[in-house]
Structure formats: structure tokens, C-alpha cells
Amino acid sequence: MSKERGEKMKVLYVVVPCYNEEEVLEETTRQLKEKMESLIKDKKISKESRVMYVNDGSKDNTWKMIEEISEKEKLFTGISLSRNRGHQNALLGGLMTAKNYADIVISMDADLQDDINAIDKMIDKYYEGADIVYGVRSARKTDTWFKK
């Protein structure tokens, strides 16, 4: 489903908490970039949409990678917590920041254990009138080695 002519496309932020994710961040970025570009091309979301990485006090090079990705790729941005505060607090920090910029916010784990193709269905449900869309995975049969 795309927006009708004359209606403003909505800004999507995908909030991705990150803790010591340097091993997976490059692949995560590649896949999320591809998904976001597809959604923009299909006129499901605004060009102002972003993926927001939230560094949760990582001890490895995660924050450095987020900074480099954000400099190279317009679709990506990042924030860094002063120290490790835990997944839920990193998620909350990202959501609280994203709400200032986005019409739609989706959370996703950095290891891509969530199916990024579900984003399309979630956005469709939003445009159908849902205020909240919640996804629960029923099986892990399709997981690649990268996600396990």
C-alpha cells in the first residue's frame, strides 16, 4: 500500500539497540539500507526516514562503526548512551529520541533475528488505521546462520 497522491508520506524510524554488535553491523546495515530504499521507492515512507542505531555502551568498535555508517549513509543515524544501560533502556532511549522526528517507529534487534520483511506489513497495518502493530515470530525455521 502506498500513499495516495497529495497525502504526505510518513517518516519511519527503525530503532536498533546495539551492544557489542561489530560482527553483525555491516550486514545489518546492508540489509536495512536495501529495505529502506525499497520502501522509499515504493512510496510507502518519506525520504526523511532513518535507521537509528542506539549504542548501549558497547566495549567493542560498535559506536565507531555507527559513526562511520552515519557519515557515509544518509539513511542512518546513531545515538550513544554514556554506559551500558541494558537492552530495554537502550530501546526506550531510541524510541524517545525517534518520536521527535518520526510518524512511525519500529524496533528491531541488531542481529536481525526479526524478519525485516515484516516491516512492509507493519507499515501497511499503520496505513489501514492501526495505532500499534505488534509482531511475534512463531518459528525460527527460516533463520540463517547469521541470525542464530
Language model: regions and residue ranges:
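Active-site Tyr-X1-5-Lys
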Residues: 148
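Structured catalytic core of nucleotide-sugar glycosyltransferases
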Residues: 3-144
